[in-house]
């Protein structure tokens, strides 16, 4: 079918440099759900607190989830949440000194944070048929990638 997987990319000869990556994404929700999150009345608990923990854990577990990612000794991870109308924005900043980039860690953190938030509020988002017509995760993107010099 195509080229077989040979393993992860060899980075042994690359220098260790400062690295930062920031990713972001949106979870679009109903006004009722937004109010429940803001009032901290969601049955499963504090959505932003639990979703922050999920994002941090996902950042640390990226090489276990994405086969070609190297295990990177992370130095920092910051998760922030902002409201944009009825959309919840998750932004994850990851930092390290290493031989390869860390944008996949930032993206994985955003996705896990948003998925956790959705899981916690899905009972509020369902319509009469059990579907989620107004709920979506969108605009997941790396907004900044920094690579220092040797």
Segments predicted by a language model, with ranges:
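C-terminal binding/interaction regions
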Residues: 1-43, 53-56, 60-70, 75-150
């Amino acid at each position: 079918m195509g080229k077989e997987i040979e393993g992860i990319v060899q980075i042994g000869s690359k220098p260790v440099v400062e690295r930062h990556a920031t990713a972001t994404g949106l979870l679009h929700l109903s006004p009722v759900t937004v109010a429940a999150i803001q009032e901290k009345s969601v049955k499963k608990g504090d959505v932003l607190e639990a979703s922050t923990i999920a994002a941090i854990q996902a950042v640390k577990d990226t090489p276990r989830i994405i086969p070609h990612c190297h295990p990177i000794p992370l130095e920092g991870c910051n998760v922030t949440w902002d409201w944009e109308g009825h959309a919840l924005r998750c932004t994850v900043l990851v930092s390290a000194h290493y031989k390869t980039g860390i944008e996949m860690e930032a993206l994985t953190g955003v996705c896990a944070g948003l998925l956790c938030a959705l899981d916690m509020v899905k009972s509020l988002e369902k319509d009469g048929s059990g579907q989620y017509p107004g709920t979506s995760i969108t605009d997941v993107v790396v907004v900044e990638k920094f690579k220092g010099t040797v």
